[in-house]
Amino acid sequence: MPPPEPLTPTAPRPVRRTVFTQGWRDVVFLHWAVDPAAVAPLLPAGTVPDVLDGATHVGLIPFRMRRIGVLGAPGLPYLGSFAETNVRLYSVDEHGRRGVVFRSLEADRLLPVLAARWVARLPYLWARMTVRRDGDRLTYTSSRRWPGPPGAGSHITVRVGERLTTPDPLAVFLTARWGLHRPGAHGPVFWPNEHPEWPLHRAELLELHESLLAAAGLPGVSGRPASVLFSPGVDVRFGPFER
């Protein structure tokens, strides 16, 4: 494979035709460093783990989805807005495109879950979820409903800290992702996105109880995360699928 494209705080390739728009709000990034060999079998054929300083990472990302829109139409205020928590890995394809691979995506609106599973072929799951804010503290809870294993979930509380004026290389590596990879019939599919540079804050992890990582095929990931970040969010545009 060619070397990965450079890490950039904004998209290296503009999205020329908008297929979906989304707002990502109150985003928490929890990440654990892991051996690339441990997660390589979980990635789509035609991709390999993306690595920084010899390690790849597993992410647990709770946030609020806001007003999904289709083909430039205004975002949907109810069906397009919901809580979400995803488990993701970091990937590179044969074109050097860096991306993420979702192992699971919990959401508390059933219709978007069904649509994403059918249209985008993404592993969305229906869950009971809450997001609560109390000053600089945010708490995210999730309990899976369908499909199983039922009851897999998470309880995460963080305290938001100071703004990062210059994010370090690890923060850029974990957040500046300009597409996702998923399996396809003829090799990996790449779904590009574009958004402004992330406004990132330090964050302190106050509570973490979760079983989503093990349910996503990552039973060996445990302990305190190596990185805890927060962002108030960005507005995102997705282009058409690419090969």
Per-segment meaning from a language model:
Residues 1-71, 201, 206, 213, ...:
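Hydrophobic, proline/glycine-rich low-complexity stretches
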Residues 3-8, 76-90, 131-136:
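Short, surface-exposed, charge-dense and proline/glycine-enriched linear segments
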Residues 10, 15, 73-77, 81-83, ...:
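Active-site-adjacent core segments of small-molecule enzymes
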Residues 27, 86-243:
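Internal, well-folded beta-alpha domain core
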Residues 50-54, 72, 82, 111-112, ...:
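Short, surface-exposed linear patches
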Residues 57-107:
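Extended, compositionally biased
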